[in-house]
């Protein structure tokens, strides 16, 4: 709708729409740096983390080509920043628009609503406002469901949804855990330098890696039929070309990154549990909640693609950073 409005005013040419995309991208880059600046201990940390996001090939690509991904990221960042600043009305607007751009943005209001329930006893008024606001963000999407008489337009269902196909694709979890750590590998190196490896967590991560290996990367029939894609994205394609499709070396490399991702998730979940146990609910928990919900909700999607990580990576990066560099003073000041 936003692009359609721009096209009516300034024309629907590719150049015109690309200018809009570049404007959105510049705003998004600023929002990424601003969000990191709220939580990082030093300014150059925010700059380095922002660079990690911006240099992602998909982030850069969607900044140039005409897709709605960058608009979704911009609105998602604006929604979370509004939540951090207790700007409930702005949060409702930005979150609702993000959901209209990409339905998987529902992780934003769901995360906020869950956080509000956890934090209700500590701050009843703000938690109540955030919870109600989160529910309101779904109204525009529900309206579209009513117009479509389904969860998507008939044309989309006919093209992308295959009868008798799996409703929940566990292999998506494998995909997103594996490639999430590859795209932020410099931070992963810092992570393993700063933490102390725990033998029990190593074994648990190996167990999850073993279980998820039974659900290898797999493109849906609809993707194979309607596109030329044979891999789940850029990095997967590079690995396939270097190591060979379905080769033993490819499986070993991907299994290693899956284990790395599982280990990081275990550390995040452990810290998350400690906060719940001690009833210490600060706003940084929202980033871990978003990552968990992303992994749980995306398997419902009709396709899997590395590009979809672009929206969640800024929040995933922050969840890891705040695990390594707890900074409670700044986090408390964010809402003031």
Placement of each model-derived feature along the sequence:
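Hydrophobic/aromatic-rich transmembrane helices and adjacent perimembrane loops
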Residues: 180-182, 233-266, 304-325
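Transmembrane-helix motifs of polytopic, lipid-linked glycan transferases
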Residues: 19-40, 78
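Membrane-interface alpha helices of multi-pass inner-membrane proteins
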Residues: 49-50, 77-82, 88-103, 108-114, ...
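Membrane-lumen/periplasm interface segments of specific transmembrane helices
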Residues: 111, 115, 125-238
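Short acidic/glycine- and proline-prone juxtamembrane loop motifs at membrane-interface regions
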Residues: 58-69, 305-306
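Short hydrophobic/aromatic helix or loop-helix immediately within or flanking a transmembrane segment
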Residues: 1-12, 22-23
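Membrane-interface junctions at the ends of membrane-embedded or membrane-associated helices
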Residues: 38-39, 84-93, 116-129, 191-198, ...
């Amino acid at each position: 709708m936003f692009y359609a409005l721009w096209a009516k005013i300034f024309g629907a040419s590719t150049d015109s729409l690309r200018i809009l995309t570049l404007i959105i991208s510049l705003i998004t880059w600023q929002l990424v740096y601003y969000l990191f600046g709220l939580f990082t201990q030093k300014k150059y940390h925010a700059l380095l983390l922002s660079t990690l996001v911006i240099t992602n090939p998909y982030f850069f690509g969607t900044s140039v080509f005409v897709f709605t991904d960058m608009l979704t990221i911009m609105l998602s960042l604006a929604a979370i920043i509004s939540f951090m600043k207790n700007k409930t009305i702005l949060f409702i607007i930005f979150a609702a628009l993000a959901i209209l751009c990409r339905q998987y943005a529902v992780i934003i209001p769901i995360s906020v609503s869950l956080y509000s329930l956890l934090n209700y006893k500590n701050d009843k008024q703000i938690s109540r406002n955030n919870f109600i606001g989160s529910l309101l963000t779904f109204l525009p999407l529900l309206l579209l469901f009513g117009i479509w008489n389904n969860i998507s337009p008939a044309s989309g269902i006919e093209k992308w949804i295959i009868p008798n196909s799996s409703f929940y694709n566990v292999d998506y979890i494998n995909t997103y855990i594996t490639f999430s750590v590859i795209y932020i590998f410099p931070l992963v190196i810092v992570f393993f330098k700063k933490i102390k490896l725990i033998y029990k967590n190593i074994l648990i991560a190996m167990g999850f890696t073993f279980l998820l290996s039974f659900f290898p990367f797999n493109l849906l029939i609809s993707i194979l039929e309607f596109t030329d894609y044979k891999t789940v994205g850029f990095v997967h394609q590079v690995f396939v070309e270097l190591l060979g499709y379905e080769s033993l070396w490819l499986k070993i490399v991907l299994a290693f990154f899956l284990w790395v991702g599982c280990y990081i998730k275990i550390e995040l979940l452990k810290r998350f549990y400690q906060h719940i146990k001690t009833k210490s609910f600060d706003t940084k928990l929202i980033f871990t909640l978003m990552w968990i919900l992303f992994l749980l909700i995306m398997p419902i999607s009709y396709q899997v693609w590395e590009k979809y990580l672009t929206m969640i990576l800024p929040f995933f990066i922050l969840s890891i950073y705040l695990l390594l560099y707890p900074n409670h003073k700044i986090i408390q000041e964010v809402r003031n």
